[in-house]
């Protein structure tokens, strides 16, 4: 991969990412910048990811303002409500509707947030399944290749089957979208693995725990609070996942 992998150099219009099929409307825009390299300067045309703010409204009350790519907004809303405890499960969702930069949802939770509960899932996953999932991310992250400005997240089912893949400018929104997409498609969270490119903070661990997903993996690093929360919830937490190495900080029994 070239050093300036996310730009189209004026003299090198054949760069590989420009030839890729990309159907993610509103994901990026083209701007001009100046490259300074030593004493040389030149004008470049580059793609940058688009960040927008959307309001999430549940039962007539705004519960969050989310910063995100302006795509997969229904999945974002559903995932956020599940990952933040506004819904106990996908069965509590009555409806979700996108109207411009607002997402209107109805639920059966009565406005009461739930707490994450420790998991007793006996799910097992092999390191190779994790590495194959990271290969999927590398292949599927088209917006990242165009812009260098997104995080990715995916959800695996049993035996490494792909349930969902999502990109977003926010690592939290990428996780929300991936979880929402997977659960809307019928995935069983207790038999699922969440893999992300972002660091494993307590906020990200909490999202997985709230959704009922027992295994969380990242190719980035963990934070101490994320490790402590994973231990309290009985989750498996692994980081710095790069073939052939996988570093497990909690719940090593789920890694085959």
Predicted regions and their residues:
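Surface-exposed beta-strand edges and their flanking turn/coil or helix-capping segments
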Residues: 69, 77-82, 91, 118, ...
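Feature captures the catalytic cores and cofactor-binding loops of soluble hydro-lyases/lyases
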Residues: 171-248
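Short, basic/aromatic-enriched C-terminal tail that caps enzymatic domains
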Residues: 246-256
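Glycine-centered flexibility sites
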Residues: 79, 85, 148-149, 180, ...
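A general structural motif
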Residues: 137, 141-149, 167-179, 197-199
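Short alpha-helix boundary/capping segments
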Residues: 68, 166-170, 222
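Intrinsically disordered, low-complexity regions enriched in acidic/Ser/Thr/Pro/Gln residues
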Residues: 2-158, 162-165
């Amino acid at each position: 991969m070239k050093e300036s992998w996310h730009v189209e150099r004026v003299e090198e219009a054949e760069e590989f990412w420009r030839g890729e099929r990309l159907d993610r409307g509103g994901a990026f825009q083209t701007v001009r910048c100046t490259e300074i390299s030593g004493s040389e300067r030149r004008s470049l045309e580059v793609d940058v990811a688009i960040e927008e703010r959307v309001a999430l409204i549940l039962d007539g009350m705004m519960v969050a303002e989310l910063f995100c790519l302006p795509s997969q907004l229904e999945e974002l809303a559903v995932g956020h409500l599940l990952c933040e405890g506004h819904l106990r499960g996908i069965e509590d969702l009555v409806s979700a509707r996108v109207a411009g930069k607002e997402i209107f949802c109805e639920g059966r939770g009565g406005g009461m947030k739930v707490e994450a509960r420790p998991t007793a899932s006996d799910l097992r996953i092999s390191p190779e399944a994790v590495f194959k999932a990271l290969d999927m991310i590398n292949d599927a992250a088209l917006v990242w290749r165009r812009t260098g400005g997104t995080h990715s997240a995916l959800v695996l089912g049993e035996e490494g089957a792909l349930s969902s893949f999502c990109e977003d400018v926010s690592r939290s929104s990428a996780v929300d979208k991936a979880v929402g997409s997977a659960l809307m498609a019928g995935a069983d969270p207790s038999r699922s693995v969440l893999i992300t490119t972002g660091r494993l903070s307590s906020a990200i661990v909490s999202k997985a725990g709230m959704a009922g997903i027992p295994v969380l993996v990242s190719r980035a690093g963990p934070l101490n609070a994320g490790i402590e929360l994973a231990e309290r919830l009985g989750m498996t937490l692994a980081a710095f996942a790069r073939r052939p190495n996988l570093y497990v900080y909690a719940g090593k029994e789920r890694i085959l």
